[in-house]
Amino acid sequence: TDYNIIIDVLPSVTINDLHEIAKRMVAAGFGKECSHVYSSLRREFLEESLSRLGLKKLSIEEVHKMPWQDLEDEIERWIKAANVSLRILFPSERRLCDRVFFGFSSASDLSFMEVCRGSTIQLLNFADAVAIGSRSPERLFKILDVFETLRDLMPEFESVFSDQYCVVLRNEAITIWKRLGEAIRGIFMELENLIRRDPAKAAVPGGGLHPIARYVMNYLRAACRSCQTLEQVFDENVVPSKGVSSSSSSSLSVQMDWIMELLESNLEAKSKIYKDSALSSVFMMNNGRYIV
């Protein structure tokens, strides 16, 4: 990754001139004023860069009211913007601050924080809005994408925001990342509730596969593609469900076993709808085979 992208755009003579101006203003006791003017200009550049990447300034309420399909598109744009910001834009701004305020580390740190704070808060607020939004099972996979993006960017948060002024931003990123983990666990709880609430209505003709069995098992199979991330999420909150032994199992496998146990209980209740005991047995056999 080219961390010098911004410095490369600016001629060396311009950076040297900015350094001379900063040095004179700090020496004259106008360090804060210099930092403020510099930060305002660079902040505008960052905001424009995020806008060009497609990131919109959305309130939490706007995110929550957005149709899911539109929010999926916003999440894709957010992932791109977050990666470019943390891996390219912010490190470049850090290097530029260090060049302009060379010899004045406190002014450099303060200026960098002021430059990046607004854009960082914009990125984190969107992730937070996703985390505290609806926990409908269909949202799992995109929320996993946001969780994984923040997780993978944690080393960048640690290195780029390492000074005293930026510790709040770093801690906020960790807090929101953990909140996304809570949201993912909440989605699995909602899946459990969905199974419990699925009513025993008309019997499936011929004792065939019930839609709830197909939905839940296809959902779990799709979720298992992100099993490493899900294991990390559930290991953060080890609370074995009642009736399931976890002595030699991961927290994720315990969760999966519990959901399948709920599904089997739900299907057993549905099998009692059949007046013909043979059809009831066929129903359990067909659905049991699909679950296995």
List PLM regions with ranges.
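Long acidic/polar interaction regions in large eukaryotic complex-forming proteins
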Residues: 2-7, 36, 51-54, 61-64, ...
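Extended amphipathic alpha-helical scaffold segments
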Residues: 6-57, 70, 138, 211, ...
